[in-house]
């Protein structure tokens, strides 16, 4: 289970404990972007007391996508067959991880979804929900995806699936990083299933959402859509 962190010292201990309780044989990788609040040190202390906890110290804040890509590489190099994305702030419920892993047995990617029947959000500001729903709808329409929650970040991948997504070409971050992986999985013909989840608004710390993340998502998704349509017209394979 890969958990990217930046200034999550107040959250990381609890989220790791919840993961370990929910799936006792799971390993956790905390990928910390040199957090000024000492998140990396807290994670190191957890790792000393639990052989299932590992820490990847990164040189600085490079974004969600870069942290996950580093985590994927680490997981692949260490021989893991399944790699999971999970937020550090408690938005993703570790107690729902067993359902994702069960769904993955019959799929290549199990995606935790807020927008399928049974999925929901709790205590999320209305404007954030509108941005997320709107972003998913815009991405789905422009990219021709059937996945309902393309911006969601609670996902379980088979490692061989990630190996087939051309991760060396991924440069996106934030919202559009998740869209990018979803579209690559669909375009590559992988079997993607959505599992209803409960998404909780964080109680401690500040959201990492920013205007720059939204702007990047808009222009990248639009670019992928235009390129994809042009490739179809010209009979070329999508990148």
What are these regions (language model features)?
Residues 27, 52, 191:
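Residues at the starts of beta-strands that form the adenosine-phosphate
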């Amino acid at each position: 289970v890969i958990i990217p962190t930046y200034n999550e010292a107040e959250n990381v201990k609890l989220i790791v404990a919840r993961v370990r309780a929910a799936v006792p044989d799971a390993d956790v990788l905390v990928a910390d972007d040199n957090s000024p609040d000492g998140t990396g040190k807290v994670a190191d202390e957890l790792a000393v007391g639990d052989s299932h906890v590992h820490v990847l110290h990164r040189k600085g804040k490079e974004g969600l996508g870069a942290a996950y890509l580093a985590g994927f590489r680490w997981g692949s190099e260490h021989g893991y067959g399944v790699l999971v994305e999970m937020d550090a702030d408690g938005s993703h419920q570790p107690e729902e991880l067993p359902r994702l892993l069960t769904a993955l047995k019959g799929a290549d990617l199990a995606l935790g979804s807020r927008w399928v029947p049974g999925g929901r959000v709790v205590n999320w500001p209305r404007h954030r929900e509108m941005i997320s729903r709107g972003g998913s709808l815009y991405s789905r329409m422009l990219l021709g995806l059937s996945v309902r929650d393309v911006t969601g970040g609670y996902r379980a991948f088979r490692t061989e699936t990630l190996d087939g997504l051309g991760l060396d070409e991924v440069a996106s971050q934030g919202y559009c990083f998740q869209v990018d992986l979803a579209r690559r999985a669909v375009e590559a013909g992988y079997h993607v299933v959505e599992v209803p989840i409960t998404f909780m608004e964080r109680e401690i710390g500040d959201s990492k959402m920013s205007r720059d993340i939204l702007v990047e998502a808009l222009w990248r998704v639009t670019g992928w859509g235009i390129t994809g349509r042009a490739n179809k017209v010209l009979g070329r394979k999508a990148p």
